[in-house]
Amino acid sequence: MQKRILVLAAGILQVPVIKRAREMGYYVITADGDPNACGLKFADKAIVANITSEEEMLRVAREEKIDGVIHPCSEVSMNVMGRINDELHLSGISKDQAIRATNKHLMREAFEAYGAPSPKSRCFTDVEVAWGAFCMDFTGACILKPSRNSGSRGIAKINSNIQMDEFARLFEIAKGESRDKQVMLEQFIEGPEFSIEIIVWDGQVNVLTVTDKKTTEAPHFVELGHNQPSCFPAETVKKIKAAAVAGVKALGVNNCACHAEVKVQDGEPFIMEIGARMGGDFISTVLTPLSTGVDMIAAAVNCALGIGPCLQPITKPQGVCIRYFCPKPGVLKSISNTEALEDSRVYEWEIYHKVGDIIPEVTSSLCRSGHVIVTEETPQKAIAYAERLISEVIFETE
């Protein structure tokens, strides 16, 4: 009998998962609250529904007699997915595991209890209590971030000489972006940032690859690009992988994809956070399959259905890099030289804005204007060519 899988969300990042699951021969039901979500048309059955409502999505799951559920590249419905798995006795993470993997405070507690390396941190709802802790218990720069949110929204770096009024302003911004209205105050780790793409099956933590990240500077740390495999020394990559594995084991998640984020300071890794899901920014859906030859989408889909994933390369590994267009803020007057993107080394490209749009300052990943993905023999060559293309496409703003 044909397996039935429910995909929670149908945005641009979920489209590759919806398409691949159908190619694998599964019946795909996709739900999204936006009737115009671009992925709905690719599913066998599209449902417009509130994917953050546990009761509504549990009703859909029962009516559709699903065999598995997946919420790729997003965190807003992780608890919903966990509840469905619990109630219908499906493969994949439980609701308790979903809560632990989306609440940064609980996540840090799990890391500390297990001995997985992570920055010193505390969680607050009251700005005055947070300010007192910052002054008394922390030294040097820190990060304020929403306790429950994904992406870079609401994150700010603060220095030791910050005034209370500015601290309070940034605290309230982070609180406004947090789904549980709690704010994390954490030690700032100075150093390069990485992500680790993982498949967990039957208790085994399988690291597929390590991703180098390029971000803006403080205060927002918006991701400008990624490359795979990592260009860092083998010993550094080994430490990063070990930290990520320890973090996943600390969370206790199973039969799912994981996307860990790690920074390295003075040669030592610190786990920033781990999502029990596929990574966004095309990392898990495009970059990882290209750089490893492993079909990570198929692996994650099969995990959700309780089917053992294939983690062997099925295509030749390549160097791969994604870079994002982030033009000068203003009204977009013209875009020129996009013909430079028509090259065999360009796997895909897209420009998100059109002439007449307002180009915002890049304060979150939602502010970026487009992307290009390049494949090459090595990641170094892919990076060089992607950077060249980013500079050759001209966005005129005023």
Task: Give each language-model segment a name.
Residues 1-97, 128, 309-310, 315, ...:
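ATP-binding N-terminal substructure of ATP-dependent carboxylate-amine bond-forming enzymes
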Residues 103-183, 190, 202-204, 230-246, ...:
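Active-site nucleotide/adenylate-binding loops and adjacent lid/helix of ATP-dependent enzymes
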Residues 138, 174-182, 187-229, 238-259, ...:
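Phosphate-binding core of ATP-grasp and ATP-grasp-like enzymes
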Residues 156, 187, 289, 369-376:
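Short, well-ordered beta-strand elements within core beta-sheets of diverse protein domains
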Residues 270-271, 341-358:
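A structural supersecondary motif
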Residues 277-299:
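ATP-dependent carboxylate-activation loops
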Residues 308-345:
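A glycine-rich beta-turn/hairpin centered on an aromatic-Pro dipeptide
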